């Protein structure tokens, strides 16, 4: 997507954490690079995991920016396809259905920030120095 800023270590950390967590679980996983404010709106139970350089937590919702394996993309291709075929609320409805069956995690604190409407539930990730991140990405 074109409205994210990524920390320089984002890909490296996500790949290292993917390898660590998926090998511990013995299965492929989904990973979201952002820690969204909407993840704090419900009193949803979560698990905290140790990643490569930070903690991660299990989540049940993402937007459309995530990392996963080709195996899981192929397995859930119908969900991704249905997500684009018609309008529904939320937009990610069919993607989020996947997380009822599969493991999805997001970092604490964020490796990417979604530069969206700060007043939306997606908002800006907490505890980020946005000026520094912007300057690093010039």
Task: Report residues per predicted region.
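Short acidic donor-binding/metal-coordinating loop in glycosyltransferase active sites
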Residues: 1-2
């Amino acid at each position: 997507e074109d409205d994210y800023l990524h920390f320089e270590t984002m890909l490296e950390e996500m790949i290292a954490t993917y390898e660590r967590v998926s090998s511990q679980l013995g299965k492929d996983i989904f990973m979201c690079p952002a820690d969204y404010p909407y993840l704090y709106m419900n009193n949803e139970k979560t698990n905290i995991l140790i990643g490569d350089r930070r903690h991660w937590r299990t989540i049940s919702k993402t937007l459309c920016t995530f990392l996963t394996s080709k195996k899981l993309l192929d397995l859930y291709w119908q969900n991704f396809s249905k997500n684009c075929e018609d309008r529904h609320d939320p937009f990610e409805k069919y993607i989020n259905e996947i997380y009822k069956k599969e493991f999805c995690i997001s970092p604490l604190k964020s490796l990417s920030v979604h530069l969206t409407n700060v007043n939306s539930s997606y908002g800006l990730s907490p505890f980020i120095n946005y000026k520094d991140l912007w300057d690093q990405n010039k």
